[in-house]
Amino acid sequence: MEDFVRQCFNPMIVELAEKAMKEYGEDLKIETNKFAAICTHLEVCFMYSDFHFIDEQGESIVVELGDPNALLKHRFEIIEGRDRTIAWTVINSICNTTGAEKPKFLPDLYDYKKNRFIEIGVTRREVHIYYLEKANKIKSEKTHIHIFSFTGEEMATKADYTLDEESRARIKTRLFTIRQEMASRGLWDSFRQSERGEETIEERFEITGTMRKLADQSLPPNFSSLENFRAYVDGFEPNGYIEGKLSQMSKEVNARIEPFLKSTPRPLRLPDGPPCSQRSKFLLMDALKLSIEDPSHEGEGIPLYDAIKCMRTFFGWKEPNVVKPHEKGINPNYLLSWKQVLAELQDIENEEKIPRTKNMKKTSQLKWALGENMAPEKVDFDDCKDVGDLKQYDSDEPELRSLASWIQNEFNKACELTDSSWIELDEIGEDAAPIEHIASMRRNYFTAEVSHCRATEYIMKGVYINTALLNASCAAMDDFQLIPMISKCRTKEGRRKTNLYGFIIKGRSHLRNDTDVVNFVSMEFSLTDPRLEPHKWEKYCVLEVGDMLLRSAIGHVSRPMFLYVRTNGTSKIKMKWGMEMRRCLLQSLQQIESMIEAESSVKEKDMTKEFFENKSETWPVGESPKGVEEGSIGKVCRTLLAKSVFNSLYASPQLEGFSAESRKLLLIVQALRDNLEPGTFDLGGLYEAIEECLINDPWVLLNASWFNSFLTHALR
C-alpha cells in the first residue's frame, strides 16, 4: 500500500501526510491504510479549492487557464495540511476579519464567498452514516459539512453542495479512479474495511465472546440482538413515549410530562425561625493563635511542649469570668474546667521533666462536661421482652432555623489569603507514575494560589486535631487527656511558626464501632466578642480570660481575649475523614484541571501557563443577589477549595440530601439554558425532597440561598 500511495499521489501531498502521521505518533509503515486515507483527504481538499476564485465584482468564478494579470482572489482558504499552530492562527485571523464564529475543531477550508468554514469528509462507508458522525463530533451549526464517497455519492449540509456540478464530478472521478487502482492491486478490501468512524466520546467497543453472549441474553423482551437494541435506543424519541409507557405500567401512575419553561421553577423555600448557630468542631474565622517563631526549644514537635511554649508568649491572663452563658449548660463547670487546665499546666511547668502527654484529674466539672455516667444503661433485649410498654424514647423534631449572615462571612473569610503558607509544595502528593511535566506544572501553579489561603489553614488544623484526637482515643481510652490544638506554618520570610488555638479534653473513648461517640470539651482562644452575634454562639459558653495588646495605626490597643468553651462529640469514622481533609486540595485541583482541559481542547494546545498567568482574565466565582461574581483564577482556586473544605467541616445528612436532590433541579435548569426543551413530571415532589433537607444547618441554608440566586440569574 505504501508503494501505491507514493506512486499515486503528488509528492507534496505524500510529504504532508507523512508529517501529519509523525505529529500523531503513528508509523506509516504499519498504518498504511491510514496513510492512504490522509493522502486522499488532502487531495480532495486541494481539488475542492483548485480553480475557484472571486473576481473584482465579488462573484465566484472558475478559472482553469485564465489571464495571469486578472485581479482574482482565491475563493477558498486551505486549512487542512497546515501546521496546527499556523492553522489556528489562520482561523483566528479569518474570524477577526469576517466576524465568523470560531470553530471548536480544526476545519478543512474557509469559503470567502459564503463566509463559512467547511469540513470535508471522504468515506468508504455510507455517506449519511459518516455525515452524522461528523455532525455529532463538530456540534456546530456554523461549520458546513460536505461528504464524498468512493462510490460517487455525496452529502452536504442542507443539500447545499457549494461547488458547481463539474468541479464535484472531477473529485468523484478521482476517488473512483483511486478505488479502481487499489482494487487492481488487491488493496481495496483491506482499505475499505479499515475505516473507523469519527472518534467521539460515544466510541463503540466491540463486544465478543462470553460478554457478547451475556449481552444478547440480558436484552429487554422483543429484542433479538444487541445491534437490534442499540439501533432502537439510538433512534428513540423520548417525548410523549415515556408518558404512554408509564400509563401502561400501573393504573396508579399518572405522569404527565410538563414542559419546563423559564417561568416554571420557583425559588426554594428557606425555613423561618431563630438564626442558625455555629456547629463546626473548631472555630474558623474567630480563632486566635498564640504563636512562636523559629521554634527550637527542648522537645520541639511534642504537642504538650509546644503548647506550653506558646502559652508562655502571652502575659495578659486574668481572672476568668463568663460573658456569654450557655443557655442549657451549667456554666460554672465550664469556668472551673478552664481554671483546672491552667492549674494543671502550671503543675507540669513546676515538674523537673515535662511529660509527653497530660491526663486531667477526673473532677466533677470535667465529668459533667464530658457526659461521664450520663449514657443510659444498656440492657440486654432478652431481659426486657416481657415489658409491656417497651418503646423507643421519643426524640423531638429538629427546630427550624433561618439563614444567618455569619455563615456567608465565614465562607468569604475562608477564601481570603493569610500572611502565612500552610502547605509545602508536596502536600498534594506526587503521582505514582513518573509525573508528566504538565501535571506537575498545574499542581505547582495551583499550590501557589492556595498555599496561603485560610481554607488551607482549616485543612491543616482539621487534620491535626482529628489525628491527635483519634490517637488519644485509642491510646488512652479511659483518660481525660489534654490535647493541644496546634498548627504549623511558614511566615512570608520563610520562618517556621507553631500556633496554639486552644485545647481539647477528651472523655472516655471505648470506640468499638465506627459510629461510637467520643465526647470532648473544646476551649479555644478568640478576640471575637460573642455578644455581637449571640445566636452564632448558642452552643458555647464564652469566658473572658485575658487582655491582649494589639498593634494598630494609633499605637498599641488592649482588647479582651475570650475563650470559647463547649461540649462536643465525634466518632471514629468522622475523625478518619477529618484526618483526610487534604483530599479537599485534590478535589479542587481536579475541578480546576477540568476547566483547563476545556479551554485547552478549544485552543487545541495546553493552556495551563496562559490560564494561570493571564492576570487580566476574570472567571465566574459564584452567584450573589447582584449576579454572577467574577474574579481572578487564584480567586476561583480558593473559592473551589473553600467549598470543598466547608463540605468537609459541615458534613451532614442534610448536606448529602440537599446536594443529591438539588443537583437534579440544577441539571434540568442547565438543559433549559442549553435549549434542550426539558420536560418534567412531579416537579413538586422534587422541590419537597430538596426542601426537607433545609432544616437548621448553616452551610446547607447558605447553599440553598446561592441556589436561589443562580435560579434568578440563570432564567432571566
Swiss-Prot record:
<dbReference type="GO" id="GO:0032897">
    <property type="term" value="P:negative regulation of viral transcription"/>
</dbReference>
<keyword id="KW-1262">Eukaryotic host gene expression shutoff by virus</keyword>
<keyword id="KW-0597">Phosphoprotein</keyword>
<feature type="binding site">
    <location>
        <position position="108"/>
    </location>
    <ligand>
        <name>Mn(2+) 1</name>
    </ligand>
</feature>
<keyword id="KW-1157">Cap snatching</keyword>
<keyword id="KW-0540">Nuclease</keyword>
<dbReference type="GO" id="GO:0003723">
    <property type="term" value="F:RNA binding"/>
</dbReference>
<dbReference type="GO" id="GO:0075523">
    <property type="term" value="P:viral translational frameshifting"/>
</dbReference>
<feature type="binding site">
    <location>
        <position position="108"/>
    </location>
    <ligand>
        <name>Mn(2+) 2</name>
    </ligand>
</feature>
<feature type="binding site">
    <location>
        <position position="41"/>
    </location>
    <ligand>
        <name>Mn(2+) 1</name>
    </ligand>
</feature>
<comment type="similarity">
    <text>Belongs to the influenza viruses PA family.</text>
</comment>
<keyword id="KW-1104">Inhibition of host RNA polymerase II by virus</keyword>
<dbReference type="GO" id="GO:0004519">
    <property type="term" value="F:endonuclease activity"/>
</dbReference>
<dbReference type="InterPro" id="IPR037534">
    <property type="entry name" value="INFV_PA"/>
</dbReference>
<feature type="binding site">
    <location>
        <position position="120"/>
    </location>
    <ligand>
        <name>Mn(2+) 1</name>
    </ligand>
</feature>
<comment type="subunit">
    <text>Influenza RNA polymerase is composed of three subunits: PB1, PB2 and PA. Interacts (via C-terminus) with PB1 (via N-terminus).</text>
</comment>
<dbReference type="GO" id="GO:0039689">
    <property type="term" value="P:negative stranded viral RNA replication"/>
</dbReference>
<dbReference type="GO" id="GO:0045071">
    <property type="term" value="P:negative regulation of viral genome replication"/>
</dbReference>
<dbReference type="GO" id="GO:0006351">
    <property type="term" value="P:DNA-templated transcription"/>
</dbReference>
<feature type="binding site">
    <location>
        <position position="80"/>
    </location>
    <ligand>
        <name>Mn(2+) 2</name>
    </ligand>
</feature>
<keyword id="KW-1048">Host nucleus</keyword>
<keyword id="KW-0464">Manganese</keyword>
<dbReference type="GO" id="GO:0046872">
    <property type="term" value="F:metal ion binding"/>
</dbReference>
<keyword id="KW-0945">Host-virus interaction</keyword>
<keyword id="KW-0378">Hydrolase</keyword>
<keyword id="KW-0479">Metal-binding</keyword>
<dbReference type="InterPro" id="IPR038372">
    <property type="entry name" value="PA/PA-X_sf"/>
</dbReference>
<dbReference type="InterPro" id="IPR001009">
    <property type="entry name" value="PA/PA-X"/>
</dbReference>
<feature type="short sequence motif" description="Nuclear localization signal 1 (NLS1)">
    <location>
        <begin position="124"/>
        <end position="139"/>
    </location>
</feature>
<keyword id="KW-0255">Endonuclease</keyword>
<dbReference type="GO" id="GO:0039523">
    <property type="term" value="P:symbiont-mediated suppression of host mRNA transcription via inhibition of RNA polymerase II activity"/>
</dbReference>
<dbReference type="GO" id="GO:0039657">
    <property type="term" value="P:symbiont-mediated suppression of host gene expression"/>
</dbReference>
<feature type="short sequence motif" description="Nuclear localization signal 2 (NLS2)">
    <location>
        <begin position="184"/>
        <end position="247"/>
    </location>
</feature>
<dbReference type="Pfam" id="PF00603">
    <property type="entry name" value="Flu_PA"/>
</dbReference>
<feature type="binding site">
    <location>
        <position position="119"/>
    </location>
    <ligand>
        <name>Mn(2+) 1</name>
    </ligand>
</feature>
<keyword id="KW-1190">Host gene expression shutoff by virus</keyword>
<dbReference type="GO" id="GO:0075526">
    <property type="term" value="P:cap snatching"/>
</dbReference>
<keyword id="KW-1191">Eukaryotic host transcription shutoff by virus</keyword>
<keyword id="KW-1035">Host cytoplasm</keyword>
<dbReference type="GO" id="GO:0042025">
    <property type="term" value="C:host cell nucleus"/>
</dbReference>
<dbReference type="GO" id="GO:0097747">
    <property type="term" value="F:RNA polymerase activity"/>
</dbReference>
<protein>
    <recommendedName>
        <fullName>Polymerase acidic protein</fullName>
        <ecNumber>3.1.-.-</ecNumber>
    </recommendedName>
</protein>
